[in-house]
Amino acid sequence: MRIGILGAGAIAFGMAAFLAEAGHHPVLWSPSGVRTRKLAEGEPLTATGAVEFSGPVAIARDGREAVADVDAVVIALPANGHRMAFDAALPHLKPGQPVIVSSHSSFGALYLSKRLAERGVLLPIIVWGTTLLTGRQQPDGVSVSVNTVRQKVDVATLPKAASAEGKALCSKLFGDRFVERDGLLAIALSNLNPQNHLGIALLNLTRMEKGEKWGQGEHV
């Protein structure tokens, strides 16, 4: 399947490598274009660790290219970038084209659903309680070190009538690791990433300021 990934950080690179290694065709989009510049010039995407992959991936020049002619769209940005990604994709999303939000925060799916309704577009919005994997992007601009691939990921779909379809798509793309939850509120409550990362960040600020290499697990 051809999958548009809106984002170009560690999670987006890791997901692209995961999908490509599984035989799918990811299309990465960097809103600024900076993080995909070398990939757009033909350098291979390389993943090491829990996901092993090296090869070329498609790069979209804008939001329209990232969404056009793909079987599904994945939002793989920090939560403060979700609205920008939604707005970039909105004019180009087609009825029935699934959108996966990895991971879901602040009921962004409701915003996307309401904006799509203004266009008369109905599609499944699939939200995750966390990301598929964890990792760190490397300074070379084309590599990612994948630390873990999660065994379980909570998932819910809007509208609820499309829940079975949403879970089936996720399993087809990413394997049998998804646990269906009742709805957006359950996903919001199960998403522990914001508060967990806040605590880690507060006690490691100087490491980040100095650009040190440090692992979250051993510095909690």
Predicted regions and their residues:
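NAD(P)+-binding Rossmann beta1-loop-alpha1 motif at the extreme N-terminus of oxidoreductases
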Residues: 1-48
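Active-site-lining helix/loop region of Rossmann-like oxidoreductase modules
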Residues: 152-220
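Rossmann-like NAD(P)(H) cofactor-binding subdomain of soluble oxidoreductases
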Residues: 74-75, 79-140
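Short acidic low-complexity segments
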Residues: 52-70
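Internal, well-ordered alpha/beta segment that forms a basic, Gly-enriched binding/recognition surface
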Residues: 117, 127-175
